[in-house]
Amino acid sequence: MGTALVQHGGCCLLCLSLLLLGCWAELGSGLEFPGAEGQWTRFPKWNACCESEMSFQLKTRSARGLVLYFDDEGFCDFLELILTRGGRLQLSFSIFCAEPATLLADTPVNDGAWHSVRIRRQFRNTTLYIDRAEAKWVEVKSKRRDMTVFSGLFVGGLPPELRAAALKLTLASVREREPFKGWIRDVRVNSSQALPVDGSEVKLDEEPPNSGGGSPCEAGDEGDGGVCLNGGVCSVVDDQAVCDCSRTGFRGKDCSQEDNNVEGLAHLMMGDQGKSKEDNNVEGLAHLMMGDQGKEEYIATFKGSEYFCYDLSQNPIQSSSDEITLSFKTLQRNGLMLHTGKSADYVNLALKNGAVSLVINLGSGAFEALVEPVNGKFNDNAWHDVKVTRNLRQHSGIGHAMVNKLHCSVTISVDGILTTTGYTQEDYTMLGSDDFFYVGGSPSTADLPGSPVSNNFMGCLKEVVYKNNDVRLELSRLAKQGDPKMKIHGVVAFKCENVATLDPITFETPESFISLPKWNAKKTGSISFDFRTTEPNGLILFSHGKPRHQKDAKHPQMIKVDFFAIEMLDGHLYLLLDMGSGTIKIKALQKKVNDGEWYHVDFQRDGRSGTISVNTLRTPYTAPGESEILDLDDELYLGGLPENKAGLVFPTEVWTALLNYGYVGCIRDLFIDGQSKDIRQMAEIQSTAGVKPSCSRETAKPCLSNPCKNNGMCRDGWNRYVCDCSGTGYLGRSCEREATVLSYDGSMFMKIQLPVVMHTEAEDVSLRFRSQRAYGILMATTSRDSADTLRLELDAGRVKLTVNLDCIRINCNSSKGPETLFAGYNLNDNEWHTVRVVRRGKSLKLTVDDQQAMTGQMAGDHTRLEFHNIETGIITERRYLSSVPSNFIGHLQSLTFNGMAYIDLCKNGDIDYCELNARFGFRNIIADPVTFKTKSSYVALATLQAYTSMHLFFQFKTTSLDGLILYNSGDGNDFIVVELVKGYLHYVFDLGNGANLIKGSSNKPLNDNQWHNVMISRDTSNLHTVKIDTKITTQITAGARNLDLKSDLYIGGVAKETYKSLPKLVHAKEGFQGCLASVDLNGRLPDLISDALFCNGQIERGCEGPSTTCQEDSCSNQGVCLQQWDGFSCDCSMTSFSGPLCNDPGTTYIFSKGGGQITHKWPPNDRPSTRADRLAIGFSTVQKEAVLVRVDSSSGLGDYLELHIHQGKIGVKFNVGTDDIAIEESNAIINDGKYHVVRFTRSGGNATLQVDSWPVIERYPAGNNDNERLAIARQRIPYRLGRVVDEWLLDKGRQLTIFNSQATIIIGGKEQGQPFQGQLSGLYYNGLKVLNMAAENDANIAIVGNVRLVGEVPSSMTTESTATAMQSEMSTSIMETTTTLATSTARRGKPPTKEPISQTTDDILVASAECPSDDEDIDPCEPSSGGLANPTRVGGREPYPGSAEVIRESSSTTGMVVGIVAAAALCILILLYAMYKYRNRDEGSYHVDESRNYISNSAQSNGAVVKEKQPSSAKSANKNKKNKDKEYYV
């Protein structure tokens, strides 16, 4: 079989018991290291961290080898002492992963003499002393000075399993070191003698007799193979070389004589039983010859329940030297082969995990040895021979008065491989037994003293013989011959038959399991099995007893059960046991056991005490309380639990049962009370799904094929893949099935009412949610009888986990109170987020999405969570709640609690204890909508609590441009306002150091009769956030951090008289008209009607919206329908018609023969400059040549626009600073006397022209378009300098875009020499209806020649409709961002009914390259854009030409421009100054100190550059009044 390894365990190796310390010292024994592969010895850990030393004596002739080694098990720190470089000692060590420090001794020590070696550790320094002649030290350059030590102190070599596990060795090169060859003795740590713990291939021997230091086995000429030839194995017995030739085919002292008749050991008889033990001529096994080749062999077959029992009571054994021989053949890994003795006087020989185990106790403690083959196992269905000898020896002590001591050497041999394993205690040399000799098994193998296994042998045993100086017991022969003292239990065949193997099975899924009969183990019992898996969790065995009620004086009845379980959690194996007086939970092994290797588990119990062992490591336990009876009444479940668990009671301590963790992996060799269980056959009988009758491990990793769909996370399991679908929104083995979504509107819930009350100590919870609210309950467990809860909720945009385990129903001291954890930020972003909670006892872990997990440890007296319900959306069980969390508005998905996907189980009807009114499917949530029917309607609520932070959320829907949505005032100047201004949302506030305005970001006005979501928040660091639908605006304010509000909170508006006293940054002059819903005030969900302190106006529940809506034909003649809350209106601007539906004739003038003219002149201080123009007019004529309308700029500028008829076709010419640009409809003849409508728009150099319903004619200048040229120009020079910039661009040859300083509109063409003759109607130009103004005798209109008004001026209703349309047109037309002049502030006071047209004109906005800068800016603008606006793109859409953009100009403009053109240098200076002054201005929000005169400074806050000399700020108010009429280019 090759070289064998001998491992030693228990508390005794080479006299290893602490009781033997004197034995080893008195004997003067050392450790002999033969230098064999696999040789090692381990001493207890030397804590060499700081100041410590160890010493030993060494004797060798070897030039290299590993002397000692220890480390921190694979991290940083280690210390190594080796022989190298001609037999010199070299020491290396490292601390904290520093560069290893090394020193090399000067003196060789491989001279065959004893040398004293001492190692002294002193923080970063280590000193090596050799004898008294040499001392060298070395220091490591480490940031840390203390060395960390985890491993034992290995001397002479390293265990093979440690060499194979490279990650467990800090110094990888130590694996390649040769083993030490020589002797080591007197190992001391800090002057105290150290005893070895275990080892292999190392012999305990006295000082070698030959002064040369060589072993007797090394004799012979140089170059020989030693004393033993032909592969014989040499060992030292009584200082003599003994050769074992049994496996060589040779015999003789040195295995030199060929002998083909040599056979195995079991059938050989002793040639001379009386031969003296003192005979120095004792040889090895090779001298044993067959006495009779035809002798009958005595063989028996054992199948797990059979055994022999020889009664020793008549003739007790009392021996000091004895021998046991037998042969075995089996496929089973574990089983008892032979046992005799009881209590502390016994011999046990067994097969343990495929190795031969020997345990001997003569009264001084157990001595154990384990023999394993190098390759494979002994359970290979081949014959193997075992021989055990125990000899009494006399040994000489050194340095003590008693020089002669007796001790016993124990030798075990398997297949002729002889190994001296050590000595028993000298004070106990006699084996005494008056009990029984058990062969092949026993009635209760687990209860035998020292038994390492719990099951009987399965296989064949041959020639089992025990002999000592006085007796020879051929046990196999006696059994077959029916000796009266030999009892045979079971049916034994006295021949070798094939024994059916216990085939392994594989549990392929967590749901698979096998039911075993009830385990009757009231007083004693044993279970053993092998398992193999790579999965971290799983319930392997479980059974419980009858439920019983445990009652104390304080609390209601509690259900308790006896139970037994073995489970895996996080790769560790646990034993759980409760016999009615308390639960024990034992970790069977400190290392993880899910590495895919086979592990043998052996559980044995006797009353309250017992052991659980994994492989060779045994852990004892003692159950608490007085009970010794384990009363199991239910079936014993293997691998998992049935799906229907209604009849089962799960103790809280069995976490895998409550977490639904079934075992996935292999099980084999299950023995219960020593009886084998054919689990493969049981699985077939029960037709269990997911159980396979074999065990193999697939080499390919399943996750390499990416089996998890929809971004599921894959983990390799045991021959399977495991998908984590928790963050995907899908379910199923491969995340292939979309998970159900539940929608909650704040009044909806889902409640799982569990059939029985649950008690758990471990939970796995995961869910996905999506919400725009910063507050709301996501999930909670609730109890009807206690305050216990595990609750997840949104709290200020974070996920808050609350776990409360109270003492109401637990006999404990007062509970500590709830534990809380927070994770995530800004989770109310209407995006899906995944939450995971893992609790294991007192350990908590909370994870949101892929962020770092938050962990915590619970305090308190217990870990049991009680609950009857799992609730979502609303908590209905509120009896023990001190405060009720806010209801949830949003969506939930994939709620999984301990493996149960409750939302989908509820939807599919798989559970019948589900109650809900939440709606399945993803739905838009509009919660509690309320309609404010009029602009004077509002409600008052309790004061908004937003002192340190704030989270507001609401939804609105309106068609109104303006309106106050929310207002709350406070102490001093503190206030908060949310309002709509020109369709855009403003958030205005004052924390005490001045008012601030933040404009919400949106691509278009929000008064589009669609629902919009608004979130406004302020955190403790004064970060303000405004989110409208998906667009976010943020700003940090300095100074005061608290919002101290005092008065009522007004929603929808305020009292009429209050508008006058609102802060200046607030535009609102009326309330909000439309719908509000889902109002969330810092976590409070008010009912706007029932919770109102008082209501005003018409407020109704629900939201029906406008009674009439815009249709395709709502407005005639291409009028534009504008949706209003109480109906709609028509914009008739570009139609030439009037009336509510654009079907009434517009104001019409007839120009008779001889010609006439209507002229409109702008006041000198009010002349507009525009980048875009819109012109529409209706006419009828038969003329081929005529001018209809002409617009001219101020004298000297030359800009113009002319609408004319040429050769019966309509066309337009214009010039805005360079060449004339013309556009014409060449396909339409319009001088046919019929009524035609022409529409013209211009944007820069681009223009469109349409006649009636003919296709629109578009004109774009050749080359780069104006917009591109404008963008290039504005990259370098902004348009703030107006005409100055135009002149600069003209010099550079670039196309201009501004129609400067418009002075007159001439209608009729008389001055141009081409008078128009015919009818003109409904003229519209950039917001002016000039013919209407002429009919109303406007002061700026002059009429000359043959011009006659037809009919009457449109009625007042028509005028109002027109005004409404004009106002709406100005607010909805697509234009550049603009800024209002300071002059509009003065004009705002004009009565609106007196001059409606003028008012509309005054509302025309000044074109600007930047966002607004004062509190009156009411135009759409991207806040915080930080750059120049694109003149042709607003809100991401390409506009059509024609938005009116107006710049006012004074009468002195012309002269000033001429002067500036002449002084180019002065222009450059002004340009640089303007760019420097305004380039870094914040455009997204505005702060105003209201203590100052804002109106007087508003012009300069526009960022305007004045074409005239600016008046000093120190001038009088009269000068300020005058300066308001200056022209500004913005």
UniProtKB/Swiss-Prot annotation:
Positions bound to Ca(2+) 3: 1199, 1216, 1298, 1300
Cystine pairs: 228-243, 245-255, 460-496, 666-695, 703-714, 708-723, 725-735, 906-914, 1075-1103, 1110-1121, 1115-1130, 1132-1142
Transmembrane segments: 1455-1475
Signal peptide interval: 1-30
GO biological process per UniProt: adult behavior; chemical synaptic transmission; circadian rhythm; gephyrin clustering involved in postsynaptic density assembly; learning; negative regulation of gene expression; neuroligin clustering involved in postsynaptic membrane assembly; neuromuscular process controlling balance
GO cellular component terms, A-Z: cell projection; cell surface; endoplasmic reticulum; GABA-ergic synapse; glutamatergic synapse; neuronal cell body; nuclear membrane; plasma membrane
Tissue specificity annotation: Brain (neuronal synapse).
Xref: Gene3D superfamilies: 2.60.120.200, Laminin (2.10.25.10)
Pfam families the record matches: EGF (PF00008), Laminin_G_2 (PF02210)
Protein name according to UniProt: Neurexin-1
Natural source organism: Rattus norvegicus
Lineage: Eukaryota, Metazoa, Chordata, Craniata, Vertebrata
Gene: Nrxn1
